[in-house]
């Protein structure tokens, strides 16, 4: 029997398993498919400073862990040694200007260096951008990493029993205490159960009378190959809030929408890669069915990217992909003990990579009964 069974092979589950094993516990990680097969392997892989102050300690713990892991990773993964730069830009629209200022100032409040740019300075810095931009905010922020390599390395770096292709059907509990999980291949017994299954977490907890306020929101990326580099740093059209988390997803309430598919929330985030390719992101939409409901989204992402940076319109399309993000109404994850022998780590939205390492640290302390590495109060069940 294991000390702990962790359900979920995304970045959150793998970070939890890594930390628990580091503490000397006998850990079994159960994943229904492959490690990083979902949103954990289908994202920008960006370390961007969160806007919300309560997330900063969790973020900093994550960065420290990834830096240590990258030096001796069992699956080598890329990690920028320092910030590549993050430029937020806006046109003349008043709402866009306000959003850009607020986002930049929120990040700068955490100590990130900020420079305000006028129209001419934007053109000198990024000449490929559209000429209707009137204000910009350049942040000394943004480190890129390989999210798949990170996730797999977290699971394999320690002595973790990884069981792939095993679907968890229920939490095994008796006498008011969880003591394992029921899978397609039988029962996995453990003294503690950690549920880190993203938006699949609520159905596992519901039979125990525990409601997790988490819904799935689909996010898309488009992968392009421009003939020449388009931008030299991360560029976001103001109003998308790539840094801030999923606050806008509070409107993605299952009770309000039922089975109706809401309109997608689409912005523009350009990410230049070391290999010369370009990742385009900036879309969120409430998930209703397992497969994408709206094939127009990646097309619209590419169209808006070409408006922000016209040379993008000539780039070769290498592909597009999507992942499902588990989101909460306030943009903060739930990382807490929710019952005897039962811990939840889910609801990280688009910030799984940003907060994953810190989440693992907190879960390790919770399971061990040790003092937490930072204030856990903002991450309780609410």
What label would you give each PLM region?
Residues 2-28:
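N-terminal Rossmann-like FAD-binding beta1-loop-alpha1 element of flavoenzymes
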Residues 22-41:
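Glycine-rich FAD pyrophosphate-binding loop
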Residues 44-125, 267-268:
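Dinucleotide-binding Rossmann-like beta1-alpha1 core, especially the glycine-rich loop
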Residues 57, 89-99, 137-153, 292-297, ...:
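Short beta-strand to alpha-helix junction loop
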Residues 77-90, 105, 114-155, 179, ...:
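Helix-loop-beta segment of a Rossmann-like dinucleotide-binding subdomain
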Residues 137-184, 188-191:
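Helical element adjacent to the flavin cofactor pocket in flavoenzyme catalytic cores
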Residues 173, 183-281, 287-292:
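Flavin-dependent oxidoreductases
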Residues 290-382:
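C-terminal catalytic lobe of FAD-dependent flavoproteins
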């Amino acid at each position: 029997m294991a000390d702990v069974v962790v359900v979920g092979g995304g970045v959150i589950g793998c970070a939890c398993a890594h930390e628990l094993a580091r503490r000397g516990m006998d850990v079994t990680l159960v994943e229904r498919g492959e490690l990083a097969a979902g949103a954990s392997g289908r994202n920008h892989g960006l370390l961007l400073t969160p806007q919300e102050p309560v997330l900063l300690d969790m973020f900093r713990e994550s960065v420290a862990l990834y830096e240590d892991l990258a030096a001796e990773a069992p699956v080598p993964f890329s990690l920028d040694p320092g910030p590549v730069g993050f430029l937020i830009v806006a046109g003349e629209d008043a709402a866009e200007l306000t959003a850009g200022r607020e986002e930049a100032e929120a990040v700068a409040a955490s100590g990130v260096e900020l420079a305000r740019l006028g129209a001419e300075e934007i053109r000198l810095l990024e000449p490929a951008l559209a000429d209707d931009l009137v204000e910009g905010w350049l942040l000394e922020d943004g480190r890129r990493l390989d999210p798949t390599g990170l996730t797999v390395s977290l699971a394999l770096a320690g002595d973790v029993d990884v069981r792939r292709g095993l679907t968890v059907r229920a939490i095994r509990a008796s006498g008011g205490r969880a003591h394992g999980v029921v899978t397609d291949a039988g029962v996995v017994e453990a003294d503690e159960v950690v549920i880190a299954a993203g938006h699949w977490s609520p159905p596992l907890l519901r039979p125990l009378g525990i409601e997790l306020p988490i819904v799935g929101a689909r996010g898309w990326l488009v992968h392009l190959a421009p003939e020449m580099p388009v931008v030299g740093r991360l560029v976001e059209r103001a109003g998308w809030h790539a840094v801030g988390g999923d606050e806008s997803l509070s409107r993605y309430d299952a009770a309000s929408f039922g089975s109706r598919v809401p309109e997608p929330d689409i912005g523009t985030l350009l990410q230049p890669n070391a290999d010369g390719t370009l990742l385009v992101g900036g879309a969120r939409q409430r998930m209703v069915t397992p497969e994408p409901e709206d094939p127009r989204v990646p097309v619209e992402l590419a169209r808006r990217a070409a408006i922000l940076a016209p040379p993008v319109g000539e780039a070769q399309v290498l592909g597009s992909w999507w992942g499902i993000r588990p989101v909460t109404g306030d943009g903060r994850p739930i990382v807490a003990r929710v019952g005897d022998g039962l811990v939840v780590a889910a609801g990280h939205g688009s910030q799984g990579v940003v907060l994953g390492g810190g989440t693992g640290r907190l879960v390790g302390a919770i399971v061990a009964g040790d003092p937490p590495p930072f204030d856990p109060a903002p991450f309780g069940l609410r």
